[in-house]
UniProtKB/Swiss-Prot annotation:
S-adenosyl-L-methionine binds at residues 254-256, 297, 323-324. CDD domains: CD_SUV39H1_like (cd18639), SET_SUV39H1 (cd10525). Negatively regulated by CCAR2. The modification Phosphoserine is found at residue 391. One of its GO terms (biological process) is negative regulation of DNA-templated transcription. Residues 43-101 form the Chromo domain. Interacts with CCAR2 and GFI1B. Component of the eNoSC complex, composed of SIRT1, SUV39H1 and RRP8. Interacts with H3 and H4 histones. Interacts with DNMT3B, CBX1, CBX4, MBD1, RUNX1, RUNX3, MYOD1, SMAD5 and RB1. Interacts with SBF1 through the SET domain. Interacts with HDAC1 and HDAC2 through the N-terminus and associates with the core histone deacetylase complex composed of HDAC1, HDAC2, RBBP4 and RBBP7. Interacts (via SET domain) with MECOM; enhances MECOM transcriptional repression activity. Interacts with LMNA; the interaction increases stability of SUV39H1. It holds the Pfam family SET. It is found in: Nucleus; Nucleus lamina; Nucleus, Nucleoplasm; Chromosome, Centromere. This is Histone-lysine N-methyltransferase SUV39H1. Histone methyltransferase that specifically trimethylates 'Lys-9' of histone H3 using monomethylated H3 'Lys-9' as substrate. H3 'Lys-9' trimethylation represents a specific tag for epigenetic transcriptional repression by recruiting HP1 (CBX1, CBX3 and/or CBX5) proteins to methylated histones. Mainly functions in heterochromatin regions, thereby playing a central role in the establishment of constitutive heterochromatin at pericentric and telomere regions. H3 'Lys-9' trimethylation is also required to direct DNA methylation at pericentric repeats. The modification N6-acetyllysine is found at residue 266.
Length: 412
């Protein structure tokens, strides 16, 4: 029996912080939890729970890191050295007072509902900070990820796993390319047209790494078999996200969104859309479930035929949080690198214009490409595409909230 259980694990019913609380309360050291004899009696402010003012003296109810709520204490302002925690507490307090149509100046005593809100906000912020750390630990790309929610008390999404590349479903194989280019300079002196030429297509980028192909034309990058190195100008998408991005909570009912923290030049690569690769049959089954939930993250890979779909509902990268717009600043391209199966392209987003720091990133879930272009990139009826007359896939009409002057009122 013991041999069968070897290597097994179960989820703990208590959080890491709760276990630390129990250790300190029982005066037990536990190196695995970071509780030792040296820090058993350390006092660090985790967050502030309440506020009051008595005879012009300010007091704060302190939650001490590693200690249960029963050990919270009221402390005068001069005893607290946690400047950032204090500033954040008052920022949250003032914002909530304004939201409740009161003065922004704090009262002498907080009512219980307001104090409870500030506690929940502090707990949420810690949860989002842990999620941000987790995302950055898992990312393989240069661009950092930050997380913000100044709108409501929603925390990290449940059951979402950050991945950097496709997660291949059962029965699906990504075949590795057998040959690569032999170019000395893939941009200025390509041999046989480099990798794009070998597939009878055009070179995709200029010397700044900006795409110069029309939307709908495929991108063929150099692969792991090529003689060129990492700095080759035909290696752009494979280098991953280069910009610092922020996952933020929208204030207009669109849930989470993504904005850039840096200027992005027109035609520059921004991110890939990754998730689970599943068959279209499985996508149809999941799509019916997602429709009932009022959301879907299905993206059909129908560059040549509709056989496979990318599902980013539970496995994906930051593109999972990018919202729709009828006037988007991102454009979809099909990309081929180490796998040349045209039924399984990688999906890349490029900037349609200069995007300034602080702007939200969006793409059109119902994107249409000129049907005259035989190399069309059709994002389908599942994720947003749609446009094929007589498509057998029926989707629930979802109201559009993009708010642009070009808004079509419905996503599908």
């Amino acid at each position: 029996m013991a041999e069968n259980l070897k290597g097994c694990s179960v989820c703990c019913k208590s959080s890491w912080n709760q276990l630390q609380d129990l250790c300190r309360l029982a005066k037990l050291s536990c190196p695995a939890l970071g509780v030792s004899k040296k820090n058993l009696y350390d006092f660090e402010v985790e967050y502030l729970c309440d506020y009051k003012k008595i005879r012009e003296q300010e007091y704060y109810l302190v939650k001490w890191r590693g200690y249960p709520d029963s050990e919270n204490t009221w402390e005068p302002r001069q005893n607290l050295k946690c400047i950032r925690v204090l500033k954040q507490f008052h920022k949250d307090l003032e914002r909530e007072l304004v939201r409740r149509h009161r003065r922004s100046k704090p009262p002498r005593h907080l009512d219980p509902n307001l104090a409870n809100y500030l506690v929940q906000k502090a707990k949420q912020r810690r949860a989002l900070q842990r999620w941000e750390q987790e995302l950055n630990a898992k990312r393989s790309h240069l661009g950092r990820i930050t997380v913000e929610n100044e709108v409501d008390l929603d925390g990290p999404p449940r059951s979402f796993v950050y991945i950097n590349e496709y997660r291949v479903g059962e029965g699906i194989t990504l075949n590795q390319v057998a040959v690569g280019c032999e170019c000395q300079d893939c941009l200025l002196a390509p041999t046989g047209g480099c990798c794009p030429g070998a597939s009878l297509h055009k070179f995709a980028y200029n010397d700044q790494g900006q795409v110069r192909l029309k939307a709908g034309q495929p991108i063929y990058e150099c692969n792991s078999r090529c003689c060129c190195g990492y700095d080759c100008p035909n290696r752009v998408v494979q280098k991953g996200i280069r910009y610092d991005l922020c996952i933020f909570r929208t204030n207009d009912g669109r849930g989470w969104g993504v904005r850039t923290l840096e200027k992005i030049r027109k035609n520059s690569f921004v991110m890939e859309y990754v998730g689970e690769i599943i068959t279209s049959e499985e996508a149809e089954r999941r799509g019916q479930i997602y429709d009932r939930q009022g959301a879907t993250y299905l993206f059909d890979l129908d560059y040549v035929e509709d056989v496979y779909t990318v599902d980013a509902a539970y496995y994906g990268n930051i593109s999972h949080f990018v919202n729709h717009s009828c006037d988007p600043n991102l454009q979809v391209y099909n990309v081929f690198i180490d796998n040349l199966d045209e039924r399984l392209p990688r999906i890349a987003f490029f900037a349609t214009r200069t995007i300034w720091a602080g702007e939200e990133l969006t793409f059109d879930y119902n994107m249409q490409v000129d049907p005259v272009d035989m190399e069309s990139t059709r994002m389908d009826s599942n994720f947003g595409l749609a446009g094929l007359p007589g498509s057998p896939k029926k989707r629930v009409r979802i109201e559009c909230k993009c708010g642009t002057t070009a808004c079509r009122k419905y996503l599908f």
